[in-house]
Regions:
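Juxtacatalytic substrate-recognition/specificity segment
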Residues: 162
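N-terminal leader/linker segments that precede catalytic domains of diphosphate-processing enzymes
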Residues: 1-138, 143-159, 167-289
Length: 289
């Protein structure tokens, strides 16, 4: 990671008053809008250098596929242009080397809060070597990949649940519901968020975790989730394994009921977080006061 900033970076909860199901089902993808138009030659060179570094993504066999780039959350739909994973990886890893325009972009992703049959949310600790290595994350998460010219967040979250927790569509389809969309400035990502309940005990669910992506699993009781978020939404310092990334906080906040969410946000903001509500209009955040 690049130099960590001295305070928590903003977490924007978009379109709080809109029905999440309507938003996530109305996705407009325009491939003619490309984030490359914002990048200078120097930034393009840095992206190539980071991607092709010894022991970097290319050397590890990663592919720089097409991803969604958030443009707008207004007019009853989500609008995206396109970027590539190499662009996202370099800018999220070392934001300080990029222009303010690039630092204010959000690349599409998905994240899910999974609740076990015996009442525990699963919080995962990412493995070493991933972009958010050793940090605490939601139950399952990943990028919003453009497939056959389309962004399909329902497909993406099912793919991530299968990839990271070996949960089949049959196991999640009856309870998997969208909860909203956010923008997390720490890793320049905008996740469409989901929650689901599974007919598996915590022990059974933990046994399914894929060690390629998940280093460790933390069970958090349903009623304990607000205080867990408050305690662990802190700067990573020398203990990244105790620090939630912004995306995870966005996912779990949207899994809470309104009163619990308001309590958690109020306490986190008083402790130094910057969580706010609004919309993303033509590439800029507009706060709802």
């Amino acid at each position: 990671m690049g130099e960590m900033l001295s305070r928590l970076e903003p977490l924007y909860l978009f379109n709080e008053d809109d029905r999440a199901n309507d938003l996530v089902s109305k996705v407009n993808f325009d491939p003619s809008k490309n984030i490359a138009a914002l990048l200078s030659q120097e930034e393009l060179g840095l992206i190539e250098e980071v991607w092709n570094a010894p022991q970097g993504p290319a050397a590890s066999g990663w592919k720089s596929g097409l991803l969604g780039w958030l443009l707008d959350t207004t007019n009853g739909q989500l609008s995206y242009g396109q970027t590539e994973y190499a662009n996202y990886f370099a800018s999220a890893k070392d934001k300080n080397f990029f222009s303010p325009k690039v630092r204010n972009t959000f690349t599409a992703g998905v994240g899910c809060a999974v609740l076990s049959a015996d009442g525990y949310f699963l919080v995962q600790q990412r493995t070493e070597g991933l972009l958010a290595g050793r940090r605490l994350d939601s139950s399952a998460a990943g990028m919003g990949v453009v497939r056959e010219g389309k962004l399909d967040f329902y497909f993406e979250i099912k793919e991530k649940l299968k990839r990271e927790l070996n949960l089949s569509e049959e196991e999640v389809k009856n309870t998997l519901v969208p909860t909203g969309i956010h923008g997390a400035a720490d890793y320049l990502s905008s996740q469409a968020t989901w929650k689901c309940e599974v007919a598996l005990s915590l022990e059974e669910l933990m046994a399914k975790a894929n060690p390629k992506f998940i280093g460790r699993v933390h069970p958090v009781g349903k009623d304990d989730l607000p205080d867990f978020l408050i305690r662990h939404y802190v700067l990573p310092g020398n203990e990244p394994e105790k620090s939630l990334i912004g995306d995870a906080v966005g996912v779990f906040l949207r899994a809470l009921d309104v009163d619990a969410r308001e309590y958690a946000i109020g306490k986190m903001n008083s402790d130094g977080a910057d969580i706010c509500f609004g919309v993303f209009r033509e590439g800029k955040f507009e706060e709802h006061l």
